[in-house]
Amino acid sequence: MALALLRRGASPTDAQRRGRRRRWPIVVAVLAGVVTLAACATFETVDYYWQGAAGQIELLANSQPIPDVIGKSDAALAARLKRIHEIREFASRELGLPNNGSYTRYTDLGRAYVTWNVFATPELSLKPRQWCFPIAGCVNYRGYFREAQAAGESKRLKAAGDDVYVGGVPAYSTLGWFDDPVLSSFVSWPETEIARLIFHELAHQLIYVKSDSAFNESYATTVEEAGLARWLASRHDSQLDKLAARADHMRSVFRDLVRTTRTKLSEIYASNASDDDKRRAKHDIVAAMKAAYESAKQGDPALSGYDRWFAQQPNNAALAAVGLYTDRVPAFRELLHEANDDLPTFYRRVRELAARPKRQRDAALDALAQRAAASAMTAQRSGTRTN
């Protein structure tokens, strides 16, 4: 995930990266300038810009070089940071991801998440609201460095009649404009999940399309999947393989539940039924999803990892947030498959897609998804497996 307030329409050039550390003394002035540019906007908008700028400054100011942290940490944290260093080097060396200062420093947040993202949809629609910014373009969420501020925005949107979902974010990407640090919010995760996260966030630094969250997140999710497969192959650790397979299974069960629910809701919302009938159907469909989840947990208690998501009472906004990360993944997987699993070729073709107008880009992704579905059906019939 990329932070809306700080990202640009493209990643910085090599020359810009080399100048980053020289620019650090004026980072505060630069970010304050963002707030100044918003002076003609509403107080609410200015306040939003300010909390983002202040949060980023605090995050970077409190970071420390990982070697320094290792030297004064307990054995468990030191071991984790050393492993993260290996993952970071692997990302650039083997996956062709940016080689810069990101994930070479560590920040202890003192809280569970670095930001909280607020997603919203109309009551009877799965189309997420968008918020547009002069620098960042349009995104499908608003990010806050303080949970109370996210809760306040959630309350405001709910009062306007929207479905709202607030999700804690363990990490985000500034697309290479700053050296994104390793955060305490994810440092204790399993190795496989840390690898996924780092590969995902670095993928955002490599390619980013302004105002197309679904493209950006699905592309980065595909990179994290491909990266993890290569990381596991390099580790030769059967326990890690089992851990990754287990996590993949849980994701698959969860995503299938969400996909099925979204399909049913989409059909209802597109129908000629009255709004009251749509509301009743929505209630029943979401209740059925929750019941299916509880049933699945009885057969596999490990699925309880998604309890937090279900505890918020799933709604359109929660379902839409999941979709941003998964809807286009089959298309990008197919693109990687057609590139013979060669990442440089894949990146080149993703850039070609990114350069197209959105309508053409979406049409190309639809065609890729159709080819992926056809290949999967053929493989199923023949008893083989693709991708």
Language model region names:
Residues V28-L37:
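Bacterial N-terminal signal peptides
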Residues D256-N387:
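Pan-zinc metallopeptidase signature
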Residues E86-R251:
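Acidic/His-rich structured neighborhood in mature extracellular/periplasmic domains
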Residues T36-L60:
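Bacterial Sec signal peptide processing site at the extreme N-terminus
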Residues L59-S73, W131-V139, A311-Q313, P330:
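Acidic/histidine-rich, surface-exposed loop or edge segments in extracytoplasmic proteins
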Residues D14-W24:
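Short, Lys/Arg-rich cytosolic juxtamembrane segment immediately N-terminal
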Residues L59, L77-I84, G143-A150, V187-R196, ...:
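Solvent-exposed, acidic/flexible segments
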Residues D47, L59-L60, T192, E217, ...:
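Metalloprotease/metallohydrolase-associated module, dominated by Zn2+-dependent proteases
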